[in-house]
């Protein structure tokens, strides 16, 4: 290699700086790309583009639920309840894991058939509730603030103290009563 006239030590620092700059550029590009992917895959249109979720979204109990029809006009979308957005890494991880899980479920089960979906509805509702319990109601609290609950006493006192989650009492997806008690 011909000598460029730049001392070896200086070349080494230039190479290190170039690698750090390249790593930063790749990292920033990855964050920007994943943020855009998160945004694009968070719409109700995207979520219901597969047969399974179209069946769930069309369910009359869900369409009549408070998250779809309420007095203040707020319409909760799929990602409002299913994707925690308080942390970019957790949001991206949740999109990735739930996306893979949903694609596998779509390809291995015939949930677009309402009879098949109804036969497994309680089981699927329990899985959804368990996920929401594990995330300690973080998605519920995007819209419902514990501090806004008038006098968090009685039933809401354990919630305010972090001893229970919203879905321990409140059903989601207008779930059947059997799923609410599990």
Regions found by a protein language model. Give the residues of each.
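Short sequence/structural segments immediately N-terminal
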Residues: 2-182
